Amino acid sequence: MAKAATPKTTAAAEAKPAAKAPAKKAAPKTTAAAKPAATKSGAPKAAAAGAIGHITQVIGAVVDVKFPEGQLPLILNALEVDNQGHRLVLEVAQHLGEDTVRTIAMDATEGLVRGQEARDTGEPIMVPVGVETLGRIMNVIGEPVDEAGPIKTKATRAIHQNAPEYIEQSTEAEILVTGIKVVDLLAPYAKGGKIGLFGGAGVGKTVLIMELINNVAKAHGGYSVFAGVGERTREGNDLYHEMIESGVNKLGGGEGSKAALVYGQMNEPPGARARVALSGLTVAENFRDQGQDVLFFVDNIFRFTQAGSEVSALLGRIPSAVGYQPTLATDMGAMQERITTTTKGSITSVQAIYVPADDLTDPAPATSFAHLDATTVLSRSIAEKGIYPAVDPLDSTSRMLDPKVVGEEHYAVARQVQSILQRYKALQDIIAILGMDELSEEDKLTVARARKIERFLSQPFFVAEVFTGSPGKLVDLADTIKGFKGLCAGDYDHLPEAAFYMVGSIEEALEKAKKLAAEAA
């Protein structure tokens, strides 16, 4: 084929391959200027940057590239192709035979032709890192997509990194207060931990993540990184403008901005969606290694798995359960293990996790469970009652709900709330068949309290003010505990259920009860 054109391309021709490459150059000495390590006589010939290959096959997002003998790029290296004036990055995924690599494209492959040149960069995909990324949106390969000019950073970093060593990791237990009652009371988040928001389609995962960005990122003062993985472009756009309006970011980035955004949305090819979480994580890791406490938001981790499964089939791997890739647990582990707190700084990660068909046993959400410190499960049955956030108080868990961490009072109130709600759940079948009248007096009281607790777990959000018309509320942890303690003890048995719906603290519920009484009079 076109192999004769550049039989032994030198790495000196890295930026612009010369048309007349020396025909008889010795291949073993081919090295990149940036990689002197490869000059050692025992080093693999494959480590040569600047090697030129030619495309032999394009199947959707998967592209095969043939290289001259002895110049095979390493696995995970980035190759660059000029696709009609547009820089297309391919990531090496497999070695086929002695001279061909199978790669995953990070953008659309329309316009590629067989025989086209592909240049080995000699390193993995590199993204810009540092304070210059704050207030900006970039894509999976670190290119700006917010039309605010290039991102001029002092450093770049490879998106594939090893997880921190055991000796570097920190294990202190501290709570991250969110101002959301149901979360802070029943499944509190760990500072420097991993939090998963589980839910089916349309139960409020993205709204909850936006509220957390609003409450925590503003109060937190440190830097935040948001990775939009395979979700709606409209929501990504809304978030960008909302951050500017609320003062978290400045238009066009620069001083005063607190959050970096990395997007690879629904319309992107699977290669971009499978790697954009790593690009975002790389930006967050850089802040952590500089001693910052970083918040890392991912919406949606399921799309990372989904993209991996799309690519896996194209790479010719035999699928495992439910059609997922056989490397599901490995892919997830490689990413999740990097999200950790070290002795230098911390990463607190909040991840929205879509649950296909509301089935928590599906391999994708089930694999994510193992990595999390706290899980917030959003339930459709609660959303149907109009209770938002639709957090399931019995399904949501946290390792922080421990008297040694949260204190005896908080722990006792949380467990009491759960036991009342559990009893109500057990009685629901009896109520449905026989009605309330058949219950004992004690059970009637439990049901009445449970219904009030259920409504008091709802809360108006700042980010949903536009839809609900009611101003958002941020509730202090002490007020949350006080309110639920009183509800469990029966201090508010005389108030109507409606008084507890969509309010912040218990004082607001008392005010609302007075209003309702005045209206009824």
From Swiss-Prot:
Its main location: membrane. It is found in: Cell inner membrane. GO terms for molecular function: ATP binding; ATP hydrolysis activity; proton-transporting ATP synthase activity, rotational mechanism. It catalyses: ATP + H2O + 4 H(+)(in) = ADP + phosphate + 5 H(+)(out). ATP binds at G199, G200, A201, G202, V203, G204, K205, T206. The keyword Iron-sulfur does not apply. It is an enzyme of class 7 (translocase). Residues 1-42 are annotated as: Disordered. One of its GO terms (cellular component) is proton-transporting ATP synthase complex. InterPro entries: AAA+_ATPase, ATP-synt_VA_C, ATP_synth_F1_bsu, ATPase_a/bsu_AS, ATPase_alpha/beta_chains, ATPase_F1/V1/A1_a/bsu_N, ATPase_F1/V1/A1_a/bsu_N_sf, ATPase_F1/V1/A1_a/bsu_nucl-bd. Keywords: ATP synthesis, ATP-binding, Cell inner membrane, Cell membrane, CF(1), Hydrogen ion transport, Ion transport, Membrane, Nucleotide-binding, Translocase, Transport. It is a peripheral membrane protein. HAMAP family: ATP_synth_beta_bact. This is ATP synthase subunit beta. CDD domains: ATP-synt_F1_beta_C, ATP-synt_F1_beta_N, F1-ATPase_beta_CD. Residues 1-21, 28-42 have a biased composition (Low complexity). F-type ATPases have 2 components, CF(1) - the catalytic core - and CF(0) - the membrane proton channel. CF(1) has five subunits: alpha(3), beta(3), gamma(1), delta(1), epsilon(1). CF(0) has three main subunits: a(1), b(2) and c(9-12). The alpha and beta chains form an alternating ring which encloses part of the gamma chain. CF(1) is attached to CF(0) by a central stalk formed by the gamma and epsilon chains, while a peripheral stalk is formed by the delta and b chains. It comes from the Bacteria. Produces ATP from ADP in the presence of a proton gradient across the membrane. The catalytic sites are hosted primarily by the beta subunits. Its EC number is 7.1.2.2. Belongs to the ATPase alpha/beta chains family. It comes from Brucella canis (strain ATCC 23365 / NCTC 10854 / RM-666).
